[in-house]
Regions:
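Extreme N-terminal basic, low-complexity initiation segments
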Residues: 2-6
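N-terminal low-complexity or simple alpha-helical regulatory segments
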Residues: 8-110
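Amphipathic interaction/junction segments at domain boundaries or subunit interfaces
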Residues: 65-168, 189
Length: 204
């Protein structure tokens, strides 16, 4: 079994082992904005409780993040290594918990100063939002992302150098499109390599 396949065989529910595999691949260039990490903490509290939020923050040594500061992506993974075992139990399984977390994080982002800027930029049009997904993600974290259209309202969104499982991004993408009143939104993600994934996105 390849190293990547072994990594995928470990569930996010398993905490340190799963996230530790990803932490071992982090470089100094892998960063996240404070606004993203603060939204993750809020989602941990919303999906779990205040005690879990505090334990997760303690795991990375940061009680609060400043919106436009850059932080090592490792802090994000450290938080999740603590939070995910409990969240997976509360929300059926790890994929459900991660989907809900991604949804919460996206909704919180859209209410931020950066998110409001994105909403002005895309003028309420789902297709404009999708075209600007690489830019939107860069406001929150590093990594390479691209969009390839396969039809008028369907595309393939590709991520490279991304440390989160597909279910997290599925929740984020659904939330952002539904917020723009897109109907029958469908997002199906697949892991294509250890730090790479792709998403088939469609709506009506």
């Amino acid at each position: 079994m390849s190293g990547a396949a072994m990594a995928w065989s470990v569930s996010p529910r398993d905490g340190g082992q799963y996230w530790g595999q990803r932490m071992s691949l982090v470089s100094s260039e892998d960063i996240a904005r404070g606004l993203f990490l603060q939204s993750v903490l809020k989602s941990i509290r919303a999906l779990g409780d205040e005690a879990l939020e505090k334990r997760s923050a303690s795991a990375c040594g940061q009680a609060r993040f400043f919106d436009f500061f850059n932080y090592p992506i490792r802090l994000h993974l450290q938080m999740l290594s603590v939070a995910m075992p409990e969240l997976a139990t509360r929300h059926t399984d790890a994929d459900q918990a991660l989907w809900r977390m991604g949804h919460c994080v996206a909704m919180d982002f859209l209410e931020s100063e950066a998110g409001r800027t994105v909403k002005v930029l895309v003028r309420g049009e789902p297709k404009r939002l999708v075209n600007n997904l690489p830019l939107t993600y860069r406001m929150s974290m590093t990594g390479e992302r691209s969009v390839r259209w396969t039809g008028p309202q369907c595309c393939r969104f590709t991520m490279r150098r991304d440390f989160m499982p597909p279910s997290f991004h599925e929740g984020m993408l659904v939330a952002m499109l539904e917020r723009l009143n897109a109907s029958k939104v469908k997002v199906v993600g697949r892991q294509t390599d250890l730090l790479e994934s792709e998403y088939d996105i469609s709506w009506q």
